[in-house]
């Protein structure tokens, strides 16, 4: 039976199954198993290159690591007797090649810098995956907006009819929010993409290691210099989770509106059957369950972020085992966010919008009253607050006509007819399309403004796609080079 080689020496006896399970991080370690092997390979290459380890043991250990990389880490490495995947892999390796050769892999490092490196390596990949999903969601929203620049709908504040807008304008509000989410994710990526490898337990090492070499071979853009900070910080995970929490808050708002819009009371959108469920008792039901689950997942991601912050709060320097408890929250939050965004993009791209009903609702609830007040300012020279009062009184009377406006203006001792107000001008202002086109400022709902916004966001989507693709290529190239050099070492000394 293979034993945990890390535990041997200082400690004696065998832990109970409950204690072993309590300490083990095996479930979360599945996320970083592949990264751990790559970190081992890079570290071993560096030890050989620096003359710290001889060719024969280097080649023997590399042979096993390359097999783990190609075939996957054996399931035995995740056994609960091992505190973590790092101990599991090292124990399996020593069992295969012997401690004289396999026992040299851990020279010049600790599990502290090893796990921090693995977390960063895998998180970099996940941030690019989520970034790609967010960019794809933006692309869906921008594409839909392009189809609906003339689709008039009511805009709401406090869930009440407020002002007319267009479906394109509404969709672009989400596209812009998600584009900021992408900016945050890519900015966080730059800080995650630093290597702590070589920091060892916290005080670095007396061996002549080359931290820049391992950083480059693993695709990192640089080294996290201070060795104590390198192993003890988890701010990179906190930042990633915070980004995901904000992202999911934005997604939950979109989900909430789609749920409301798909209701029998509103009927603005019909979701594709693939994103709905039915009732076990009510045969007519088509429920937006996927979006409801996504709305709930937003709470889970917020919870993961809060839990991670609470775990790190007030921890003394440097490494503390508390940090192990943060990792499951990281992967849970990352996984929920990525899946949610991909599913939301699918739900939107397959949805059918009821633009006729939207247009019917656009003029209800006196939603054109703001444009009417604005027109009275422009045409009659009234102060806006005065026009606001007049229109508000007319709304209270139950109608918006020249007659109701003139009656409402008597309290202000104003003769609207003398100021040039006509029924034709009133009716024009009450037309939702007229009010929309009047709002042609940057970011407004007018067709020209929306078209400009679409072009801007299309360029943003294109830039995001390019940035992610370039970074993926850079990382893939680095790992390809790493494996190539590892194979060269193995074959050269066999």
Curated annotation (Swiss-Prot):
Q: Does the keyword Glycoprotein apply?
A: no
Gene Ontology BP term (one)? arginine biosynthetic process via ornithine
Protein location: Cytoplasm
User: Which Enzyme Commission number(s) are on file for it?
Assistant: 4.3.2.1
A GO MF annotation of the entry reads: argininosuccinate lyase activity
- State the top-level EC class: lyase
- SUPFAM superfamilies (UniProt xref): L-aspartase-like (SSF48557)
The disulfide bridges present are none
What InterPro entries would the database entry show?
Arg_succ_lyase_C, Argininosuccinate_lyase, Fumarase/histidase_N, Fumarate_lyase_fam, Fumarate_lyase_N, L-Aspartase-like
Q: Does the keyword Coiled coil apply?
A: no
Tell me the keywords, alphabetical order: Amino-acid biosynthesis, Arginine biosynthesis, Cytoplasm, Lyase
The protein's annotated pathway: Amino-acid biosynthesis; L-arginine biosynthesis; L-arginine from L-ornithine and carbamoyl phosphate: step 3/3
One Gene Ontology cellular component term attached to this UniProt record is: cytosol
Q: Which domain of life is it from?
A: Archaea
Q: Which reaction does it catalyse?
A: 2-(N(omega)-L-arginino)succinate = fumarate + L-arginine
Q: Which family does it belong to?
A: Belongs to the lyase 1 family. Argininosuccinate lyase subfamily.
Enumerate the HAMAP family for this protein.
Answer: Arg_succ_lyase (MF_00006)
Q: What is this protein called?
A: Argininosuccinate lyase
- Organism per entry: Methanosphaerula palustris (strain ATCC BAA-1556 / DSM 19958 / E1-9c)
Q: Which gene encodes it?
A: argH
